[in-house]
Amino acid sequence: PPHLAAIAPWEACSDWYRDQVCRGGIPSGGFFDELVNMLRVPNGIEDIHAMLDRFPYINEYWDKEKRVAFQNIRVPTYLVASWTSNVHPYGTLRAWNRISSKEKWLRIHNTQEWPDQQTPKYRDELRDFYNHYLRGEDNGWEKTPKVRLSLLDPMGPDVVDLPVEEFPLPDTDYRRLYLNAEEQSLAWEPQTVESSRSYHCRPLNTEPVD
């Protein structure tokens, strides 16, 4: 909208189908059944699980209505994601890479989203971001590093708010891994022996269906 001056998608969702209800091609609507039961609003809430049952494959509903038009986002943006959640990082990091904003910041933290959002330091940062763009305050926000990462260390304290020039890191070494169903492992080389595994995939709180 023309009046929108800045946005701060913290722990965002930008593609409902690919990031949430059918990640990896596996339908999973149970989590949203729980959300519908927990969230009470006067005018109701969309039943995403029911829509997944109605439209199990990618179509205009998922791609037009439930996927962000990244190219249309041009306002200053402050995005936040984490390494520790399996819900929001995909959507947030995809948005970071694809939005058209020239003024954008990314912070990847090392905790769960709710404690991070309530940390005084980061609440103050968010206030500075909005005050800078909505009120025109000269508070030094533009000097904030464009990208800050967290490095998780299982043997010691994590490194937090590490400034880097860009993300993904330019010297990232992307490697392809191959499934080995027989050994239930990942291998560096393509597998020459055919193997398979089967499993039951069922929604939360339901009985297995053969």
Which residues does each PLM region occupy?
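C-terminal, loop-rich substrate-recognition/catalytic regions characterized by aromatic stacking residues
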Residues: 115-210
